[in-house]
Amino acid sequence: MGLSTASVYPENTQAAFRYAAELGYDGIELMVWAEPASQNIDTVQSYAKRYGVRVLAVHAPCLLISQRVWGADPVAKLERSVRAAEALGADTVVVHPPFRWQRRYARGFAEQVGELEAHHPVKVAVENMFPMRADTLFREGAVRRLERRAGPGRAVSAFSPSYDPTDTGFDHYTLDLSHTATAGTDALELARRMGEGLVHLHLADGRGAAHDEHLVPGDGTQPCAQLCEYLVDTGFRGHAVAEINTQNARTTAARSALLARTLEFARRHLTGATPDPQPRHADLP
């Protein structure tokens, strides 16, 4: 079970390694974004060595807030992400479908993904996203509206050709359970469509709000436990990674508790085990 460095924001990348070591996570998914340390492979390698936590995956800098990280060319950024994963010993790169305005990138995206996988020992796992919903402007009642409509209602996709990567078809996928909530997508059905190509799970939850929530699994309406059990039953051998929002945690202890709950959920439903309840503070420098 891995921990996304995004899960500790507004704390930094080093803090994510520290939490992972303390709580007993197996590894890290590195979110490459504006923080300089996240962009520096030598720095990340030093964290991995110091805390004894390996890097499982690299999340390419493809968010709206990271459009200028590692340059402005998304083609070059994806290639650099794959090379970074290789250098860090990670076997997976997580990437979003191209934005609609990235026309050249979008036209060649599927071909580039295939070529990168053919020439590097890294899986490029394309992540399911969600549409921009009209009720984003009216957050009150958004969850009830989604339930009533059995879908997101009036919405527009910012992604080309779709926010659902199975509409295009790739060899490898990332399934995000917060994104399925916002999109009104059946997570189990999406997992079945992804099939053996599902190699990476962002374990989170959501209630169907118009915005992306990334709740602790079990705190929303997504079939998190059922999906984990489905993965066990189908022989899933990829990475499950906690990608939750802890911005509202007022203290490190509160943030640690949220991360520990997520790890306990994963251990229970993916392995039938529970983590050591005593963080390993004494082992850290």
Locate each region found by the language model.
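The substrate-binding groove and active-site-proximal loops of carbohydrate-active enzymes
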Residues: 31, 63-64, 68-71, 99, ...
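N-terminal small/glycine-rich loop or linker at the start of catalytic domains
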Residues: 1-3, 56-65
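Histidine-acidic metal/acid-base catalytic patches
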Residues: 1-2, 9-21, 49, 79-91, ...
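Short active-site-proximal "capping" loops at secondary-structure junctions
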Residues: 33-38, 61-65, 247
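Short, well-structured secondary-structure segments
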Residues: 26-33, 54-59, 93-94
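Glycine-rich anion/phosphate-binding loops
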Residues: 39-40, 68-80, 103-108
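Glycine-rich, proline-tolerant flexible connector loops at the mouths of alpha/beta enzymes
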Residues: 29-50
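Short, structured patches in soluble enzyme cores that scaffold and shape functional sites
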Residues: 97, 126-130
